[in-house]
Structures are given as structure tokens and as C-alpha cells.
Amino acid sequence: MAETNFNYSKLLRNLVTEDNVLNEVVVSFLYQLFPRDLFVRAFSLLESADMFIYVWMPTPKEADELLESLYNGTPLYRPIVRPRGPDDRPVCVDLDHWFCSCTEFAATCRPHLVGDTPLSDALFRPTEAADPDDCFGMLAGLQHLRADPEKLMCEHLFAFAILLQTDLRVLRHFSTGPGAQVFVLGITSIDEWLKLHLNVV
């Protein structure tokens, strides 16, 4: 199969079986598929209990409804990674615009900023469209993207994309039950939502 036709979402949604168990065969394959230990770092982040997804919901919802809305609805949400040290800052992720506030992601653009070529010319060119069913792989087919998608990826973007752009089953596996390691929190108060943006985002 040609790399341009590879459906990452279809593969990553098989990370968790129907019985809510990690599929070790898929985990091993993904380890080989992604470069420079990216999968290992993203998977470690998924198991770190440092990932939070804050969801704005003016009307309170049950926990399962809240998770389903992240796949079946269009809620306003903020994926955030808790700082690891006292001097660290929270990492904010925006999957819709493929942006992360971490230094690793910023470093991918830095060489283009110091060069003579404008950033838009350095990173963009016409490309073929991606498979419309492959939410996770859409980065590779963004109109005009020149840079290698793997270079515009960090562990935070990868981990949240695994949770939010593959299958609801994967999100449930990591965010529900006694062993939950990713926290999905609904916010119903506009004051609390604004405080989140002032204090974290």
C-alpha cells in the first residue's frame, strides 16, 4: 500500500480491542511504524496521568455522554498536559490547528524563522488530499503542506490525536474505570471556563 494511502486512524483505532484491552500486536507495530521513539513518548504520556481534556458544556452531561460528545458532537474543549516540574508550564494542544505550546514543536519551526525564506513558503506547497476517513492522517494531506508531517509532530499532539481522532473506544479505555489515566472534565460554569484560560491556557 502506498504511504499516501495509509489510513492512520484505522490502524490506531485498533489499539484497543472490543474487550477494552490493549492490542499488543498493534502496539508493537506502531512502535516500529513511527520515528525517533515518538510512539514510546506519546504512549508513556497516555499512561502518565498528566493529560486533561476540559470540555465546555453549558448543560451538565453524564460521563459517557461527555466522552461521546467529543466524537459525535462539536464541543469546545481544551487538551492540556500538566507540568511535570515546579518550573514547567502546562502544555496546551490545539488539534484543530495542529499546534502545541511545547518547546519541541516550536523547535520544528525555528530554523525556518531565522532563514530568508518566509515561514509560509518554507512549510507549504500543494499536495494531494488525504483520505477523508482518516482524521489522524489528515495532517499529511493538508492543502499546501510542504513539511514532513512527522516533523510537525510532538508527543503531546500524537497522544491527544490518538485519544480524539481515532475511535471512542480508545478514549474510553484511557479515561474511564479505576485505572483511568486521562481525565476528561466537564465545565458548566462560564466563570470556571474563563479561569481555565486565564490560569492555564
From Swiss-Prot:
Q: Where's it found, cell-wise?
A: Nucleus
A Gene Ontology annotation in the biological process aspect, one of them, is:
DNA repair
Task: Name the UniProt key words of this record, in alphabetical order.
Answer: DNA damage, DNA recombination, DNA repair, Nucleus
Would the keyword Zinc-finger turn up in this protein's UniProt record?
no
GO cellular component terms attached to this protein's record: nucleus
- Asked if the record carries the keyword Nucleus, the reply is yes
* Protein's job: Plays a role in a RAD51/RAD54-dependent homologous recombination repair (HRR) pathway to repair MMS-induced lesions during S-phase. Required for error-free repair of spontaneous and induced DNA lesions to protect the genome from mutation.
| Similarity comment: family membership | Belongs to the SHU2 family.
Designated name of the protein: Suppressor of hydroxyurea sensitivity protein 2
Which species is listed as the source? Eremothecium gossypii (strain ATCC 10895 / CBS 109.51 / FGSC 9923 / NRRL Y-1056)
Q: Which gene encodes it?
A: SHU2
